[in-house]
Amino acid sequence: MTKFVFVTGGVVSSLGKGIASASLAAILESRGLKVTLIKLDPYINVDPGTMSPFQHGEVFVTDDGAETDLDLGHYERFIETRMKQSNNFTTGRIYQSVLEKERRGDYLGKTVQVIPHVTNEIQEYIKRGAGLGTPDAVDVAICEVGGTVGDIESLPFLEAVRQLALKQGPNNTAFVHLTYLPWIATAGELKTKPTQHTVQKLREIGIQPDALLCRAQHQVPEEEKEKISLFTNVPEWGVISMWDVDTIYKVPRMLHEQGLDGLICDKLRLNTPPTNLKRWDDLVHETEHPQGEVKIAMVGKYVELSDAYKSVNEALKHAGMQSHVAVKITHVDSETISDANARDKLSQYDAILVPGGFGSRGVEGKISTARYARENKVPYLGICLGMQVATIEYARHVAGLEGANSTEFDPKSANPVIALITEWKDADGTVKTRDENSDLGGTMRLGAQSSDVQAGTLAHSIYGDVVTERHRHRYEANVQYLDQLREAGLVISALTQREQLTEIVELPKEVHPWYIGVQFHPEFKSTPWSGHPLFNAFVKAAIERQKAPRKP
């Protein structure tokens, strides 16, 4: 029977519920259990697809084309289970489903209310995410409830998980509450009162935590744990310190050494082999003992919030581990770059990466970045928009297509080398269409797609005959310009079979040592255990660049 662990948060947001949940999942997985994670988001958006990266951070895309919370990226990097649409849902999706049922008459004329209709729907989504009653059912489903206890938005979710725990029984459910202990410098002590209050709020709802994860800058002293235990009705061994660390990959070991997984297994009556965290220890050792360093410039539009590029940042770090080097990433605002100052801004880096993005702001700076990398033989990786700006730059300055641009930025461009995709096959094989008047939400080319890779290319040396990666974009290289770009020397090394959509562009080895742009998002499939072949090759190219003489 599937067991459930519900992870809630209190006092403030952004405490790291996602990392805590993923770490617990990793420990349980190391005990031989089949684990999945489910993220419950209390906002009314149907999904985060139309939300600003400045507000929400990265949108993580799954193989089945779901646009999800960035925490699902942590989940995939920490455990073996691949995430799907059913692993993330929002208040908006729940209400959408309830209203559709009401319109169909599924509620038989009843007055539709938060309790029981919305809370029942939440429970059904949770059970679906856990695969309950199917061959895909897991041993343990860890459900992270977004938001903060006390917020009005989270109340239906908390009520739903309370009800689900009651139905499943005490030996099939556990509650873990993440809280914050502020350090008052003038008093020289940690304060436990906010934690007492947040647990009190949780107990008023009808939820008694089995474990408290106490976030603080440093380890929580034993006397403070005793005090917290007394006032929250949580046994002392369930009050667990979760302090700041220099790498998130230390968290599984931290939680295990304080007995969190043992507590959960006892509560859920799970008889498992001992925990084996050797590969996590090896991973931490690798991060702490690099044999060198490479400097990479990430030229983007959302650099004020590093979470906007969370998976790219992690993929670069993973690739560094594969080559035993530390990757020092500098986020450079593309609005600050032009042809005139690109050398001053970028010459100190070993490689350049231009990630994805939407809208015209900062695009010319990205085009200047691609030009600098091409002309100065700097290793270049363009992802999604990064591939498109590389194509625009090449069209303008090599192919002689004056005014070349994307119709996203200039609808009246004389040479629209990048244009809106009007028809494509989605991840599940269905043919989708759209035009400039279509809704923004849920109308992109999304999910895993496969393409053949041209032999003898850089892409082929990385991927082999076929590339399968996840997509999230509306615009694509214009098929009408491919022959002109090829004649000018641009290598189009991967195309989709049906629509002939460009997946990868690159420069020949004799022209540039390492220059490639991909329309997809390879960062979503990188893991700390093996990295990702494209990022691994990119970091190796940066290492080679270090050895080469630089232009003054």
UniProtKB/Swiss-Prot annotation:
Modulation of this protein's activity: Allosterically activated by GTP, when glutamine is the substrate; GTP has no effect on the reaction when ammonia is the substrate. The allosteric effector GTP functions by stabilizing the protein conformation that binds the tetrahedral intermediate(s) formed during glutamine hydrolysis. Inhibited by the product CTP, via allosteric rather than competitive inhibition.
InterPro entries, alphabetized: Class_I_gatase-like (IPR029062), CTP_synthase (IPR004468), CTP_synthase_N (IPR017456), GATASE (IPR017926), GATase1_CTP_Synthase (IPR033828), P-loop_NTPase (IPR027417)
Keyword annotations from UniProtKB, A to Z: ATP-binding, Glutamine amidotransferase, Ligase, Magnesium, Metal-binding, Nucleotide-binding, Pyrimidine biosynthesis
Glutamine amidotransferase type-1 domain sequence ranges: 295-548
GO CC terms: cytosol
EC number: 6.3.4.2
Renumbered residue ranges of the record's region Amidoligase domain: 1-270
Positions annotated as active site in the UniProt record: 384, 521, 523
Function statement: Catalyzes the ATP-dependent amination of UTP to CTP with either L-glutamine or ammonia as the source of nitrogen. Regulates intracellular CTP levels through interactions with the four ribonucleotide triphosphates.
Further facts: CTPSs have evolved a hybrid strategy for distinguishing between UTP and CTP. The overlapping regions of the product feedback inhibitory and substrate sites recognize a common feature in both compounds, the triphosphate moiety. To differentiate isosteric substrate and product pyrimidine rings, an additional pocket far from the expected kinase/ligase catalytic site, specifically recognizes the cytosine and ribose portions of the product inhibitor.
Protein name: CTP synthase
